Structure formats: structure tokens, C-alpha cells
Amino acid sequence: MGISKKSLISVTLVLFLIVSIGFLYVFNPIQTKPKRVGVLFYQSNPTTLRFLAGLKTGLAKQGYYQGENLDLVVENFQNSTPKVTMATLRKIAQKRVKVLITTGKDLTITTAHTFRDKPIIYTLVSRPITKETIQTIIDEKNITGVSYFTPYDRTLELAQRIIPHFKRLTLILPPHSAWTDYKRLSEAAQKTGIQLNQIATPLPDLERTILNLKGKTDAIFLPYDIQLIFRAGLLKAALIKASLPAISNNLEYQSGCVLTYYAEPETIGEIAGQMAVKIFHGAKVKYLPIELSSYYKLTINKALLEKLNFSIHEDVLSYANEVIR
């Protein structure tokens, strides 16, 4: 008994549909249920906002889009008390996030204590993450991250080209600062023939300290220190009043520095997004190597240079990714 042509066509169509569905299921990594990612910021600033933009870009390049198959749960812990921080983390835990992306060592440690079984991507770290970096975290097998080396050598070399007779540099820090890169900055200063001095000044005395440095130093270095970052506006005003140029490797000081040479936050965000997708697809955090971003950007503040009556070298401006006019 033969099979009719109509039946053969029907069977062929059914088989085609089955194969097509199977193909899509096997080769399309995107599942219908959104992947939920917790993004935890120690503070909201230009760096973290640009990092978040890069994170979204990195996830989108892998086929994950916010509001479709991706749910980013973004929390800002700026000025949060320990009690509020814990309450917020418990709320995030109830949302059953797949991956946690953190900034700030203290926040990362607290998060790891709260989410002992969740993968954590620790980001925006100004030096390569090592076992020592996270030795106080309970289960470091659940933590990987994205870091960068602050390019002090290159920063000082560029600064020498825009600051007249740049031979003396003063590092300002509040007492008991957690900043730990003095040795690397000191080595870079020695390499470039610059005398580095460090001053610890109480926060209420910042303006007076800067004004007293006029004629005693050629430039001020502003490090990554949360207490100083919160006072970036005050620092800028004091520096202009003292006619002293400042340099930094942190975006938060950009408007008050003649030169800012910084690790590009969008790139770090993209790398974090790529790592998150690997975890979505089953990668174990303990086998994911810590990534090191090596993409930096240079901002020259031409408007501030003019205000300080410094000559402007066009060749240096040509290197800048951004010129503030």
C-alpha cells in the first residue's frame, strides 16, 4: 500500500518543524527566562555609570538585553549604614540573582558573606586581584573579577609635558587612608626624576594645606580615596586658589585636574559582561581567570591649564582622548 503524495508532504513538514525546533533549542543559548544579575555599587559616580553602560554593551554583544532576556538589579550603597546594607542585600537575595557584580572591597566582602553560594565578579580594582586581595572573603572559589594596573609611569611622563619645570609632586591623603599604592607611585616618580612627598591632612584642613603648598611643590597628586572623592569640588576650588595643578588616575577628579589618565570603565564593564555570560552557560567561577584590562584614556583639561596660565603643547593634546575646553 503506497503513501500518498499529500501524506508524504505532511510528514516532511512535520519532520522539518521538529528539526528546526531542535536546532533552535541546541544552538540558541538564550533562554526565555530572563537571567537576573545583581550589580552592586559602593557609590554612584561617573566611573560606575560608565561601567554600567559598558556592562550592558558587553551583555548585548552576547545576545542579552535588559527588559527582554536580562534583568539587571542595580543597587547603589553610597552612604548606606551597615544595617541598611544588610537589609538591601537580603532583598537582592530574595530576587534569586544568577550572578553578582560588585565594586569596592568592603562591599564585596559583605556580599560574599551574604551570598555564600553565588558567583561574584569583583570589578574596578586598581591592581590585579590576588588571593591576598580577597583573603578575608569566606569562599574565594566563588569570586573572580576584572582589574587594571594604574599606569603611574605614563601619567607622570605625560604630566611632565604640560606642567612647567615639574620636579616636585605632593601626594595628599587623609589620616588612616586605605590607599595602598604609595610604593608604586614612588617608584614611578623615581623613574621619571620627580621628588615625591606625602602629606596626611585632616579633612577640615584640606584647603589650608593646599594653600600652604604654593611654592613648595609643582603639582598635587589626587589618589583614589573615598573621603577625598566626596570633596572633589572643594579640592578643585582650593587648587585654583593656590594656582597649583593636580593630576590623577581617577575620573572623579577630572574637572579639577589638568591631566587625568584612567582605566576606561566601559571596557571593564564589557569584560565583566562577557564573564557573566560564561557563568550563564555553566562556567565555574573557580576556573575563570581574573581578567586584566589594559585600555586607558587620557583627558587634558585645557580650560584649567589656561586658567593657571600654563602654555599648552599641541603635541600632548593630540594624544588626548578628551580635551576639556
Model-predicted regions and their roles:
Residues G2-R325:
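Short hydrophobic alpha-helices and adjacent helix-cap/hinge residues
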